[in-house]
Amino acid sequence: MGEVVTGEGYAVGTLDDLGEGPGFRKVRAPLGVTAFGVNAVVIPPGIESGRHFHDEQEELYFVHQGEVEFVFGDGEQRHRLGPGGIARVDPRTVRQIRNVGDDDAIYVCVGGKDGYVGRDGRVPEGEENRARPIAS
């Protein structure tokens, strides 16, 4: 296991830097995140999370690896997602995540309270914000 590297205004690391084995990998504190909650979760095959909901926190899930099934509400609504899959869930919606694949599933969950900042990104003075080949 390595370690998260921090600098002035940034932090970088890997999932392995945040822990080993199945379960929650807390991202917020090690990377110094203050604006929202974020965790990475590793679920072994055939394992499901507990059902839960939140009072205020909307959540966005991004499936990085494996195949998961999201179970919503009373269990009648089920949706399978593989790598690159995204799900957004209202705070009060009961949800459960199940690993229905043959390998470990890894997903990232980001949560926050209502309120949109809007587009506030800016380009440093004298630079262009465009995709271009990497300069060697």
Features from the language model and the residues they span:
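A short, N-terminal "cap"/entry segment at the start of jelly-roll beta-barrel domains
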Residues: 1-35, 50, 118-136
